Amino acid sequence: MEAKELVQRYRNGETLFTGLKLPGINLEAADLIGIVLNEADLRGANLLFCYLNRANLGQANLVAANLSGASLNQADLAGADLRSANFHGAMLQGAILRDSDMTLATLQDTNLIGADLRGADLSGATLTGACLRGANMRQEKKGYYTNLQAAILGRADLQGANMKGVDLSRADLSYANLKEANLRDVDLRKADLSYANLKGALLTDANLSGAKLNGADLQNANLMRAKISEAEMTAVNCQGAIMTHVNLNRTNLTGSNLSFTRMNSADLSRANLTKANLQEAELIEAFFARANLTEANFINANLVRADLMSANMVGADFQGATMPDGQVRHH
């Protein structure tokens, strides 16, 4: 079928085009709101600036299709093959992208507010500047998760997004807005979160081993039981964060703000806390074996039963701190 015929039939009131084979079709700027093209073959199609709001494209083949600037608000793309598709600047607000394959897709500056991305594969996709506020990527069951491995999400807006159990290993989230996002059980190994906004984010049981968090804002975040070993966390702001039972083994926390944190039973062995601010921090039973605490600020911190035995404490300030033996340091 030619593009002209399809558009004409749609204008005449026909909307059902299930399973049509239309590879390479040129439908640039066509108005096809609510069209049903589920299971259609649209490989390499030109859908630039197309109006596809509420369209049904479930299970459709859109490999390498051009959907730049297209309007797909509330469209159904569940199970669609979107590998290497170009969605640059597209509107996908409230769209259903469940179980879709978006490997290596371009989603730069895309509006994905409230989109359903559960079980979607976005590995290697580019989402720079995309807005994913309130998007749902929550892991439903074991082995069924959204894959964002090595995805590029620099400066993306993910505020309040539900990303529980998502695979973000090696992803670029530098300067991303993850304020109050649900990142519970998330795999962020070797991810780049430099200068990311993680204020109030939920990161319980998350794996951030080897991640870059330099300059990130983690104020009031919940990092309970998170694995952050061998990570880069220089100049991080963790003020007021919950970090009980966190693993920070061999992590570089030089110059970080850890004041008013709750770090009871934290593993800080071999961590570098040079010039870190731990004022008023709760560090009951924290483990500091071979940690570098040079010039760290522990003023009024609670270090009851903490292990400081082999730590380097040259120039550290423990004024007003409650020491491991329960005694308050007065000088």
Curated annotation (Swiss-Prot):
Pfam families, per the entry: Pentapeptide
Gene3D superfamilies: E3 ubiquitin-protein ligase SopA
Sequence ranges assigned to domain Pentapeptide repeat in this UniProt record: 20-59, 60-99, 100-139, 151-190, 191-230, 231-270, 271-310
Record keywords: Repeat
Superkingdom in the source lineage: Bacteria
Ranges that cross the membrane: none
Protein name, entry field: Uncharacterized protein slr1819
